[in-house]
């Protein structure tokens, strides 16, 4: 009987610990769980395509404060905003974690959005994911083209990726998560060029965040709640002019 009681106590402890860990991961945008909902008939569908910055890595009270959720609040009930952000993903197909390799990519196509908000490229700054400026631009154009192949031709907004910052004790050219600020600048310029060539509106999140390191969590890479709110405001302002 004593052994059974000890076993029950251990099970309760293990369950409680697991629940605590899960809650921490979930509410800080670290779980990888996607937020999904079904659009109502007549709603304008907005797809937010991106990486961990779109997903909301490190956001406190993540379910209510990641940028696509905040964008939904700003846009109102006439719109349905769906996040297709996945942590660690990159534009280039030869990267360590290409976006096209995910079911989220297929789901973002199937969503048949009226509006695409595309913000990706931070993970392409990693040394192992960088194949040169032309290679990145070609990969970007190819990926964007995937969203124009259906009967519906969505309005596509290109966001430059946010700036990234060195932590106080960092050395060399890499930030945390192995991102390279100098290459983030290069990618931002490539995105601007691509937007001009394609005739897509550009939302310059890179310029918006460059002078605002206080908008980032301690890793210097992921926007905090204030940064997510600033991104949502910029995106909504671009759509509703």
Model-predicted regions and their roles:
Residues 20-32, 55-66, 95-102, 185-195:
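Short, mixed-charge, low-aromatic patches
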Residues 1-49, 53-62, 72-78, 110-111, ...:
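N-terminal secretory targeting modules
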Residues 38-40, 62, 67, 153, ...:
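Intrinsic-disorder/low-complexity coil detector
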Residues 36-38, 65, 95, 159, ...:
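Compositionally biased, intrinsically disordered/low-complexity regions enriched for serine, proline
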Residues 5, 100-241:
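Alpha-helical cap/lid subdomain in secreted, periplasmic
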Residues 38, 73-75, 85, 148-150, ...:
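A generic structural signal for short, solvent-exposed coil/turn residues
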Residues 43-47, 53-141:
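Conserved SGNH/GDSL esterase-like catalytic core that processes O-acyl groups on lipids
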């Amino acid at each position: 009987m004593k052994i059974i009681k000890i076993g029950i106590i251990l099970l309760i402890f293990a369950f409680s610990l697991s629940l605590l860990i899960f809650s921490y991961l979930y509410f800080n945008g670290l779980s990888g769980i996607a937020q999904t909902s079904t659009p109502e008939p007549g709603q304008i569908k907005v797809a937010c395509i991106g990486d961990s910055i779109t997903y909301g890595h490190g956001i406190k009270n993540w379910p209510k404060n990641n940028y696509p959720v905040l964008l939904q609040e700003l846009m109102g009930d006439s719109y349905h905003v769906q996040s297709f952000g996945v942590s660690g993903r990159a534009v280039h197909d030869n990267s360590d974690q290409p976006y096209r390799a995910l079911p989220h990519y297929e789901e973002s196509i199937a969503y048949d959005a009226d509006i695409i908000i595309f913000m990706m490229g931070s993970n392409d700054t990693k040394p192992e994911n960088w194949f040169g400026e032309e290679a990145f631009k070609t990969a970007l154009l190819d990926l964007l083209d995937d969203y124009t192949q259906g009967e519906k031709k969505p309005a596509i907004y290109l966001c430059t990726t946010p700036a990234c910052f060195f932590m106080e004790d960092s050395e060399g050219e890499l930030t945390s998560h192995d991102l390279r600020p100098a290459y983030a600048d290069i990618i931002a310029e490539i995105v601007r060029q691509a937007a001009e060539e394609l005739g897509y509106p550009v939302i310059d999140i890179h310029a918006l965040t460059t002078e605002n390191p206080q908008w980032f969590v301690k890793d210097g890479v992921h926007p905090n709640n204030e940064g997510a709110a600033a991104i949502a405001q910029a995106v909504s302002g671009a759509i509703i002019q």
